[in-house]
Curated annotation (Swiss-Prot):
Family: Belongs to the NifH/BchL/ChlL family.
Biological process according to GO: light-independent chlorophyll biosynthetic process; photosynthesis, dark reaction
Keywords: 4Fe-4S, ATP-binding, Chlorophyll biosynthesis, Iron, Iron-sulfur, Magnesium, Metal-binding, Nucleotide-binding, Oxidoreductase, Photosynthesis
Domain of life: Bacteria
Name of the molecule in the record: Light-independent protochlorophyllide reductase iron-sulfur ATP-binding protein
Disulfide pairings: none
Cofactor note: Binds 1 [4Fe-4S] cluster per dimer.
Record note on quaternary structure: Homodimer. Protochlorophyllide reductase is composed of three subunits; ChlL, ChlN and ChlB.
Encoding gene, per UniProt annotation: chlL
Organism listed in the record: Prochlorococcus marinus (strain MIT 9312)
Pfam family, one: Fer4_NifH
Positions of [4Fe-4S] cluster binding: C124, C158
Length: 295
């Protein structure tokens, strides 16, 4: 008796959530997925980058993909209800919803959606992401959007939370100049490499965050073929902007704040005009230890 094992759909050895092609985001929009180690500043980076794109005259949509649903609060200045919570209220009859029920306008016209997530230990985050995109398409809310940013939960790269990679053109990885952050980045590079076999997503580069220096990031980039697209030092104004529930573009324009604003504007311009798809060759765990962990 023989059996046949079909080739994995999303990269060799992976068993992942496959999105319905009917809910793909339309061609034309720049779609960016932001990943990185938990607590590294992805939501701050995503929100400020969304604000920067809007400053360049682009119509921007940010989708938070985290059960904490705190991705967009610096844009909206509040915690907004999640798509999954709103759908549950109408017993998942999406035709009963209006766009204003789940999409909220934030700073400088940035549109904000929080997908939310299933209760802890149940369900799949990838399903929630898919339902969010499906809902946006049903209401024709993606047709005039120039830039879509997915802000993704922590450094989880399972099939569910890798789902935004199936919609994205590019992935930006946020990291600090330390071993743990770079170790997580290496795992994310592996996930993107697997997805790139069957989807359009490519590595867009690295965002160095909360780091005075970038020597460890530079060593990793040189070894793996990555590139740093922006460098944000540990500036107190960025921390204070989170406490004030606002973007860096709404802070008093001190010298430090203007420098950060310009770096975000430069990152946005480069993602629009000057980004090169990176191949990215992840290291084995032991290789990272040898490269960064021990002298």
């Amino acid at each position: 008796m023989t059996s046949t094992i079909n080739k994995p759909l999303d990269g060799e050895g992976s068993v992942q959530v496959k999105q319905d092609p009917k809910i793909n985001i339309e061609e034309g929009a720049l779609v960016i997925a932001v990943y990185g180690k938990g607590g590294i500043g992805k939501s701050t980076t995503s929100s400020n980058l969304s604000a920067a794109f809007s400053k360049l005259g682009k119509k921007v949509l940010q989708i938070g993909c985290d059960p904490k649903h705190d991705s967009t609060f610096t844009l909206t200045h509040k915690m907004v209800p999640t798509v999954i919570d709103i759908l549950e209220e109408v017993d998942f009859h999406s035709e009963e919803l209006r766009p204003t029920d789940f999409m909220f306008e934030g700073f400088n016209g940035v549109m904000c959606v929080e997908s939310g997530g299933p209760p802890a230990g149940t369900g799949c985050g990838g399903y929630v992401t898919g339902q969010t995109v499906k809902l946006l398409k049903e209401h024709h809310l993606l047709e005039d959007t120039d830039v879509v940013i997915f802000d993704v939960l922590g450094d989880v790269v399972c099939g569910g939370f890798a789902a935004p990679l199936q919609h994205a053109n590019y992935c930006l990885i946020v990291t600090a100049n330390d071993f743990d952050s770079i170790f997580a980045m290496n795992r994310i590079v592996s996930a993107i490499k697997a997805k790139a076999k069957n989807y359009k997503v490519r590595l867009g580069g690295v965002v160095a965050n909360r780091s005075k220096d970038t020597d460890q990031i530079d060593k990793f980039n040189e070894r793996t073929g990555l590139k740093t697209m922006a460098h944000f030092k540990d500036v107190d104004a960025i921390r204070r902007s989170r406490l004030k529930k606002c973007t860096i573009f709404e802070m008093e324009p001190t010298e430090d704040v203007i420098e950060v604003q310009n770096e975000y504007l430069s990152l946005a311009k480069n993602m629009l005009e000057n980004v090169e798809p990176l191949e990215g060759n992840p290291l084995k765990d032991r290789e990272i230890f040898d490269l960064l962990g021990f002298d």
